[in-house]
Protein backbone atom coordinates (compact mmCIF):
# COMPACT_ATOMS: atom_id res chain seq x y z
CA UNK A 1 0.00 0.00 0.00
CA UNK A 2 1.28 3.47 -0.87
CA UNK A 3 1.81 6.04 1.84
CA UNK A 4 -0.34 9.10 2.45
CA UNK A 5 0.91 12.29 0.81
CA UNK A 6 -0.13 15.88 1.36
CA UNK A 7 1.13 17.70 -1.73
CA UNK A 8 1.43 21.38 -2.55
CA UNK A 9 2.44 21.92 -6.19
CA UNK A 10 3.60 25.46 -6.95
CA UNK A 11 4.77 27.14 -10.12
CA UNK A 12 6.91 30.27 -9.83
CA UNK A 13 7.66 32.72 -12.61
CA UNK A 14 8.45 30.66 -15.73
CA UNK A 15 9.20 31.52 -19.36
CA UNK A 16 7.05 28.69 -20.70
CA UNK A 17 4.63 27.77 -17.91
CA UNK A 18 2.34 25.64 -20.12
CA UNK A 19 5.22 23.32 -21.05
CA UNK A 20 6.15 22.65 -17.42
CA UNK A 21 2.58 22.48 -16.12
CA UNK A 22 1.81 20.00 -18.89
CA UNK A 23 4.71 17.77 -17.83
CA UNK A 24 3.65 17.86 -14.18
CA UNK A 25 -0.02 16.90 -13.76
CA UNK A 26 -0.76 16.86 -10.05
CA UNK A 27 -1.96 13.24 -10.02
CA UNK A 28 1.27 12.05 -11.65
CA UNK A 29 3.50 14.10 -9.34
CA UNK A 30 1.67 12.56 -6.36
CA UNK A 31 2.06 9.05 -7.80
CA UNK A 32 5.79 9.49 -8.46
CA UNK A 33 6.41 10.82 -4.96
CA UNK A 34 4.30 8.17 -3.21
CA UNK A 35 6.30 5.41 -4.91
CA UNK A 36 9.52 6.90 -3.50
CA UNK A 37 8.21 7.38 0.04
CA UNK A 38 8.66 4.90 2.86
CA UNK A 39 6.32 6.78 5.22
CA UNK A 40 3.58 9.39 5.12
CA UNK A 41 4.69 12.81 3.90
CA UNK A 42 3.88 16.47 3.51
CA UNK A 43 5.78 17.77 0.51
CA UNK A 44 5.79 21.06 -1.34
CA UNK A 45 7.06 20.91 -4.92
CA UNK A 46 7.97 24.29 -6.39
CA UNK A 47 8.97 24.78 -10.02
CA UNK A 48 11.16 27.87 -10.44
CA UNK A 49 13.11 29.86 -13.01
CA UNK A 50 16.91 30.13 -13.17
CA UNK A 51 17.03 33.29 -11.07
CA UNK A 52 15.10 31.80 -8.13
CA UNK A 53 16.91 28.46 -8.41
CA UNK A 54 20.31 30.14 -8.38
CA UNK A 55 19.40 32.35 -5.42
CA UNK A 56 18.24 29.36 -3.36
CA UNK A 57 21.31 27.29 -4.25
CA UNK A 58 23.59 30.23 -3.42
CA UNK A 59 21.86 31.10 -0.14
CA UNK A 60 21.50 27.56 1.21
CA UNK A 61 24.34 25.57 -0.38
CA UNK A 62 26.79 28.40 -1.12
CA UNK A 63 26.93 27.36 -4.77
CA UNK A 64 26.26 30.25 -7.13
CA UNK A 65 24.45 28.48 -9.96
CA UNK A 66 21.02 27.01 -10.63
CA UNK A 67 20.84 23.25 -10.13
CA UNK A 68 18.17 20.76 -11.19
CA UNK A 69 16.66 19.93 -7.78
CA UNK A 70 17.10 21.20 -4.24
CA UNK A 71 15.70 19.28 -1.28
CA UNK A 72 14.92 21.05 1.96
CA UNK A 73 14.09 18.30 4.46
CA UNK A 74 12.62 19.29 7.81
CA UNK A 75 11.53 16.04 9.47
CA UNK A 76 11.73 12.35 8.64
CA UNK A 77 9.61 10.86 11.43
CA UNK A 78 6.81 10.23 11.99
CA UNK A 79 5.98 12.16 8.80
CA UNK A 80 8.46 13.25 6.13
CA UNK A 81 8.17 17.01 5.62
CA UNK A 82 10.14 18.62 2.82
CA UNK A 83 10.25 21.20 0.07
CA UNK A 84 11.51 20.09 -3.35
CA UNK A 85 12.53 22.95 -5.63
CA UNK A 86 13.11 22.14 -9.29
CA UNK A 87 14.63 24.65 -11.71
CA UNK A 88 12.58 24.38 -14.91
CA UNK A 89 15.22 25.64 -17.40
CA UNK A 90 17.89 23.32 -15.96
CA UNK A 91 15.52 20.34 -15.99
CA UNK A 92 14.49 21.09 -19.60
CA UNK A 93 18.11 21.43 -20.76
CA UNK A 94 19.17 18.21 -19.03
CA UNK A 95 16.20 16.30 -20.47
CA UNK A 96 17.16 17.46 -23.96
CA UNK A 97 20.84 16.56 -23.47
CA UNK A 98 19.96 13.13 -22.05
CA UNK A 99 17.38 12.31 -24.73
CA UNK A 100 14.53 12.07 -22.20
CA UNK A 101 11.07 13.53 -22.23
CA UNK A 102 10.58 16.46 -19.88
CA UNK A 103 8.04 14.45 -17.89
CA UNK A 104 10.43 11.50 -17.51
CA UNK A 105 13.22 13.75 -16.21
CA UNK A 106 10.87 15.53 -13.79
CA UNK A 107 9.72 12.13 -12.49
CA UNK A 108 13.32 11.05 -11.89
CA UNK A 109 14.26 14.28 -10.11
CA UNK A 110 11.17 14.11 -7.90
CA UNK A 111 12.04 10.53 -6.93
CA UNK A 112 15.64 11.66 -6.30
CA UNK A 113 14.48 14.58 -4.16
CA UNK A 114 12.03 12.42 -2.20
CA UNK A 115 14.85 10.01 -1.36
CA UNK A 116 17.00 12.92 -0.15
CA UNK A 117 14.08 14.04 2.04
CA UNK A 118 14.20 10.62 3.71
CA UNK A 119 17.92 10.81 4.46
CA UNK A 120 19.44 9.19 1.37
CA UNK A 121 22.55 10.85 -0.04
CA UNK A 122 25.19 10.32 -2.70
CA UNK A 123 28.26 12.02 -1.25
CA UNK A 124 30.26 8.77 -0.96
CA UNK A 125 30.62 6.54 -4.03
CA UNK A 126 29.07 3.53 -2.28
CA UNK A 127 26.07 5.62 -1.15
CA UNK A 128 25.69 6.98 -4.68
CA UNK A 129 25.55 3.47 -6.13
CA UNK A 130 22.93 2.37 -3.59
CA UNK A 131 20.83 5.51 -4.17
CA UNK A 132 21.04 5.19 -7.97
CA UNK A 133 19.93 1.55 -7.75
CA UNK A 134 16.96 2.55 -5.58
CA UNK A 135 16.02 5.33 -8.02
CA UNK A 136 16.24 2.89 -10.94
CA UNK A 137 13.98 0.39 -9.13
CA UNK A 138 11.38 3.08 -8.37
CA UNK A 139 11.49 4.44 -11.93
CA UNK A 140 11.00 0.91 -13.32
CA UNK A 141 7.93 0.41 -11.08
CA UNK A 142 6.60 3.68 -12.49
CA UNK A 143 7.12 2.43 -16.06
CA UNK A 144 10.18 4.52 -16.91
CA UNK A 145 13.57 3.51 -18.27
CA UNK A 146 16.66 3.40 -16.05
CA UNK A 147 17.54 7.09 -15.59
CA UNK A 148 21.25 6.28 -15.55
From Swiss-Prot:
Binds 1 zinc ion. One of its GO terms (biological process) is rRNA processing. Keywords: Cytoplasm, Endonuclease, Hydrolase, Metal-binding, Nuclease, Ribosome biogenesis, rRNA processing, Zinc. Its cofactor is Zn(2+). The gene is ybeY. Its EC number is 3.1.-.-. It is found in: Cytoplasm. One of its GO terms (molecular function) is RNA endonuclease activity. This is Endoribonuclease YbeY. Zn(2+) binds at residues 112, 116, 122. Single strand-specific metallo-endoribonuclease involved in late-stage 70S ribosome quality control and in maturation of the 3' terminus of the 16S rRNA. The keyword Transmembrane does not apply. It holds the Pfam family YbeY. It comes from the Bacteria. One of its GO terms (cellular component) is cytoplasm. Belongs to the endoribonuclease YbeY family.
Amino acid sequence: MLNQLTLSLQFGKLENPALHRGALPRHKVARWLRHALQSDAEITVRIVDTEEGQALNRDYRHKDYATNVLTFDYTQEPVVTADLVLCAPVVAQEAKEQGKTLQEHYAHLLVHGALHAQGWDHEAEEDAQVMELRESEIMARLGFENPY
